[in-house]
Curated annotation (Swiss-Prot):
Family: Belongs to the UDP-glycosyltransferase family.
EC number in record: 2.4.1.-
Descriptive protein name: UDP-glycosyltransferase 76H1
Species in which this protein is naturally found: Stevia rebaudiana
Gene3D superfamilies: Glycogen Phosphorylase B (3.40.50.2000)
GO molecular function: quercetin 3-O-glucosyltransferase activity; quercetin 7-O-glucosyltransferase activity
Keyword Transferase found: yes
Main function: May glycosylate diterpenes or flavonols in leaves.
Positions contributing to UDP-alpha-D-glucose binding: 248, 306-307, 324-332, 346-349
Entry-linked InterPro entries: UDP_glucos_trans
Keywords: Transferase
């Protein structure tokens, strides 16, 4: 959202960002050109996500709505009303409700891929037909309405069905009338899903990805980045390092984390591993590492608490990315032409992993067993298969460059977006 706001401001549009002080919000002093509105989220904090994601989002929306509505009413004269447009994250449905109540146009920004919206749209239908939650016999089957994705790739499998349906209907699909939909993707990456969305919603759909390549801002990371890892990468051979990062939310059992460590050690290849404090259940940081591996891992790799990911992926030493396949990580990886080892956990990560392995063919899903991990790293860094994946990833990288430059699809989409906002 900050990247989008920065771009729109550069095009002469006045921007106010509603933010939640309890949630690692950007430092307003770093962005004097923007106005920031702190919203009251009650006593809610990031730690409350552990109580359940659905409940967390519902509570956040409930707590923020009154303050946001009051701000708009107090600062909106009859003249101002004609110039106010609300751009909201798709999970912040309260902003869409307020826009409807006050007669303001609203635009939805989706930070996930396009197919996440189409998948969420069909879940209620699949449930009515007895196909969601999918029985075991269907898990490996392709969903006819969502080729080439399988039932096992659907988001929210394993969640209580009533919560999933409510999330799909109330939160994930824009039921409040929206003037347009923005998606951080590219036309050539998701043509089928984008066609379905445009046919279904009948509103302009602007593909404005990858945002991190189009708009340069200060780091938007919610964790402090350890930039010393770049100096370490500078000393490594080209395409010799596997970069491992499972995002900012995933939690691992000790057994899984130890298996990952053993696999990295067995591979005999260099690695840069992001282990967030508290990422492994029951441990503050890397205390889970077997004593027998500590020396070996220090000699071959580097473990950091957080890394400047876009800089790491662009580094010549990085030959593969072992990822949870969050959409930001996926599109950042594609933009640098790096093959992926996929370890998805939830939400759109399963869909992204399927894209990587079966559509774009720039990576594969990894089995969490030390021997399998060692073989997977070899596949990416050494084997001919890895080189073929790298070539396909580099082809996508070149297409991304074309898309974000003058005359490209994302470049033109941004220009069209500015004209559209100005017309509202």
């Amino acid at each position: 959202m900050l990247q989008l706001a920065t771009y729109l401001h550069s095009q002469g549009i006045s921007i106010t960002i509603a933010q939640y002080p309890n949630f690692n919000s950007p430092d307003s002093s770093n962005h004097p050109e923007l106005t920031f509105l702190p919203l009251s989220s009650g006593n809610l904090s990031v730690a409350d996500i552990s109580g359940g994601f659905f409940k967390f989002i519902q509570t956040l929306n409930h707590n923020c709505k009154p303050h946001f509505r009051e701000y708009l009413v107090q600062n909106m004269s009859s003249d101002d009303k004609e110039s106010i447009v609300i751009i909201r994250d798709n999970l912040m449905f309260f902003a869409g409700e307020i826009a409807g109540e006050l007669g303001l146009p609203s635009i939805i920004l989706r930070g996930s891929n396009a197919v996440m919206l189409t998948a969420s749209d069909i879940i209620p239908q699949l449930h009515q037909e007895g196909r969601f939650p999918p029985p075991d016999s269907l898990l490996q089957e392709t969903i006819p309405e969502l080729v080439p994705f399988r039932y096992k790739d659907l988001p929210f499998i394993g969640y209580p069905i009533h919560q999933t349906l409510e999330f799909s209907i109330t939160m994930m699909t824009p039921k409040s009338p929206a003037s347009a939909i923005l998606i951080n993707t590219l036309e050539f990456l998701e043509q089928s899903a984008l066609t379905q969305i445009r046919d279904h919603y009948k509103v302009p759909v602007f593909t404005i990805g990858p945002l991190h390549k189009i708009v340069t801002t200060r780091s938007t990371s919610i964790l402090e980045e350890d930039t010393s890892c770049i100096n370490w990468l500078d000393k490594q051979s080209p395409k010799s390092v596997v970069y491992v990062s499972l995002g900012s939310l995933a939690k691992l059992d000790e057994k899984v984390a130890s298996e990952m460590a053993c696999g990295l050690a067995m591979s005999n290849h260099k690695f840069l591993w992001v282990v967030r404090p508290g990422m492994v259940h029951g441990f503050e940081w890397v205390e889970f590492l077997p004593d027998s591996l500590v020396g070996e891992m220090k000699a071959r790799g580097l473990i950091v608490k957080w890394a400047p990911q876009t800089t790491v992926l662009a580094h010549n030493a990085v030959g593969g990315f072992w990822s949870h396949c969050g959409w930001n990580s996926t599109i950042e990886c594609l933009a640098e032409g790096v093959p992926m080892m996929c370890q998805p956990f939830f939400a759109d990560q399963l869909l992204n992993a399927r894209y990587v392995s079966d559509v774009w063919k720039t990576g594969f899903e990894i089995v969490i067993e030390k021997g399998e991990i060692a073989c997977a790293i070899k596949r990416v860094l050494v084997d001919e298969e890895g080189e073929e994946m790298r070539q396909r990833a580099m082809e996508i990288k070149e297409k991304v460059k074309i898309a974000i430059n003058d005359g490209g699809s994302s470049y033109d989409s941004f220009k069209d977006l500015v004209a559209f906002i100005s017309s509202l």
